[in-house]
């Protein structure tokens, strides 16, 4: 009896060598979430499609259903997003963090959400020429957490739903918190930072960049008249809060994100 087969759009998340010539590949697929497959002979020089099975390449993959691993018998390139990423360490690390986060979200949910795959693809496309790769990653994490049901509250108090603007953020509570509900360990935050995060969360990139630029220029002007710098740059604050919210809800740090913060 012939084995069941199917075709899927897919991105390579990670790979493992198997034996002398084979490779196990973890894919993020468009409609089936994470799929683990084995590609026979792809490490040989004569492999027809082995060179395509790498991160930042979108593929149309032919899978045959297996007991534990699918068999990968064909893979056609749909899009290559490595240009502008693989030659820039910051962009490369941010893009790697996107793939790592997508895998983590897929593992955390039994049911696949079709919104995740296009979000990953769009982010990789943007990272090819992104002047602010870390901010692009933060945007992805905010939007991906929305898909997962972990979106931080950024205007209303996460505890009592009182409207903002608010001046504190607490991941465990769910995001922004008012003065009445503020827990002892909540982080102080400029309301403009929360506003910029809200814009990024809702895919309003241009407005967010305008706000971030204006806020940082204003902070720089204020700090230049004082002997001590008091304000954290807006983009830095966004990154810290986004990372804290992600780590609280996933209970795991992203290895690529830790590397990115050191670059």
Predicted regions: what they are:
Residues 1-263:
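Non-catalytic alpha-helical scaffolds and adjoining flexible linkers that form interface surfaces
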């Amino acid at each position: 009896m012939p084995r069941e087969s199917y075709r899927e759009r897919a991105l390579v998340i990670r790979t493992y060598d198997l034996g002398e010539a084979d490779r196990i590949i973890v894919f993020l697929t468009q409609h089936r979430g994470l799929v683990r497959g084995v590609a026979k002979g792809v490490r040989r020089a004569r492999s027809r499609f082995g060179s395509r099975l790498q991160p930042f390449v979108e593929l149309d993959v032919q899978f045959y259903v297996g007991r534990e691993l699918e068999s990968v018998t064909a893979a056609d390139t749909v899009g290559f997003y490595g240009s502008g990423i693989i030659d820039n360490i910051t962009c490369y690390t941010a893009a790697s963090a996107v793939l790592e986060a997508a895998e983590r979200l897929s593992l955390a949910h039994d049911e696949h959400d079709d919104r995740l795959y296009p979000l990953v693809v769009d982010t990789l496309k943007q990272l090819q020429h992104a002047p602010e790769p870390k901010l692009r990653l933060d945007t992805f994490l905010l939007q991906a957490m929305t898909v997962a049901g972990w979106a931080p509250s950024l205007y209303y108090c996460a505890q009592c739903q009182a409207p903002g603007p608010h001046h504190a953020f607490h991941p465990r509570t769910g995001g922004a918190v008012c003065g009445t509900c503020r827990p002892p360990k909540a982080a102080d935050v400029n309301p403009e930072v929360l506003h910029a995060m809200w814009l990024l969360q809702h895919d309003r990139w241009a407005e967010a960049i305008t706000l971030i630029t204006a806020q940082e220029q204003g902070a720089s002007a204020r700090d230049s008249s004082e002997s001590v710098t008091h304000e954290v740059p807006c983009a830095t604050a966004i990154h810290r809060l986004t990372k804290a919210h992600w780590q609280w809800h996933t209970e795991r740090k992203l290895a690529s994100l830790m590397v990115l913060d050191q670059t």
